[in-house]
Amino acid sequence: MKDAKDPPPAREGRDTSVHKIDSRHSPHGRDGQTYLASGKSVAMRLWKDEQPNDGDKPASRRDYETVGYVISGRAELHVEGQKVVLNPGDSWVVPAGAEHTYKVLESFTAVEATSPPAQVHGRDE
């Protein structure tokens, strides 16, 4: 009898390798983000100690969905005319194609996941 804790067998030709990413050696994006682990359909990035800004960052639209989680600090997220304040422990979603921008209120650290991966094919530019 198979133990309930045993993982399902790998399918032939399927990549089942695990990848560990050390953020100290990860590439950085032009806006200050650190690119973390990335798979075929989702990628992670870290915004670390982003400093307050006056909110003059222009809004943008991306062809990927973003979900995020606030580790520390505070920011305002503006999406399609709506504003939410993000505090430690909050999470959020920015739908693909939605016009959005962030205004950092206090030194801000957050992790985001994007689907499809933001840094592939110039999506993050």
Q: What are the roles of these predicted feature ranges?
A:
Residues 96-121:
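Ligand-binding loop in jelly-roll beta-barrel domains
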